[in-house]
Regions:
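Active-site-proximal binding-pocket segments
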Residues: 1-154, 159
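Trp/Phe/Arg-rich N-terminal binding region typifying the photolyase-homology
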Residues: 1-17, 30, 43-47, 72, ...
Length: 237
């Protein structure tokens, strides 16, 4: 993200090909692909906010390389639900699977899924040899697609009390380290910027999770505002 900036939101090395749509398969969102291990993992993602890293690759492969969805919308869908989500890592991983950030696409067939996820399923659209993947038609179950329309609801916070001449540590969605300058007498602010969450929305479960993490930091105050607004409160006059 530091190196490429917003460029990570576009195909980095190669244009993803083929692309039949810019949405996400309804069957993936509804955990109804017919691949039991994948469907169960998506259901667990909604409940817990977690998904095994290998399973994330399987889901991305089905979304991008089997359903032929451009990677961006499915990546946004997964990021929205992950408690440990990092947009840069997520976006670049999806691009790697889709072949837009690698020299080939990533595929996993049913035997691979069965091996690593204690499954014995057969006769699915993934129950093929790897040589067949490049010529497979989009399975009927994956053809219905939708956009992923999501938003993060941030609750307005009460005014916080800050001293202008006191060192201020600013925490954010990606930095809630309870040991950060733990031995210093400073004022601590968890800053939730609406513009960030508008661009990279996450679920209410994710917001609740970071609020729980913030409870581990003594004296931290929560502020829903842009960074510029915060600087006006703490910069010396």
């Amino acid at each position: 993200w530091i190196a490429k900036g917003d460029g990570i939101n576009e195909d980095l090395k190669h244009a993803q090909d083929p692309v039949s749509n810019h949405g996400i398969s309804d069957a993936i969102v509804d955990h109804g692909t017919g691949i039991n291990a994948i469907d169960n993992a998506i259901g667990d993602l909604y409940k817990t906010g977690y998904m095994h890293n290998h399973m994330r690759m399987y889901v991305a492969s089905v979304a991008c390389n089997i359903a032929q969805s451009h990677w961006l919308t499915p990546a946004r869908w997964m990021y929205y639900h992950l408690l440990d989500g990092d947009w840069a890592s997520n976006a670049l991983s999806w691009q790697w699977v889709a072949g837009s950030n690698a020299n080939k696409k990533y595929y996993a067939n049913q035997d691979n899924i069965n091996k690593y996820f204690n499954s014995s399923q057969k006769q699915t659209f993934l129950d093929v040899d790897y040589e067949q993947f490049g010529t497979l038609a989009i399975p009927e179950v994956l053809t219905e697609v939708s956009d992923f329309d999501s938003q993060t609801k941030l609750t307005d916070t009460a005014d916080i009390l800050l001293e202008r001449d006191k060192k201020t540590l600013v925490y954010n969605y990606y930095n809630l380290d309870p040991d950060w300058h733990a031995d210093e007498e400073v004022q601590r602010v968890l800053l939730l910027e609406p513009s960030f969450f508008k661009t990279y929305p996450v679920s209410q479960k994710c917001i609740d999770f970071i609020m729980q993490l913030a409870n581990n930091i003594a004296g931290i105050q929560i502020l829903v505002a842009e960074f510029e607004s915060l600087t006006q409160q703490v910069d010396p006059a």
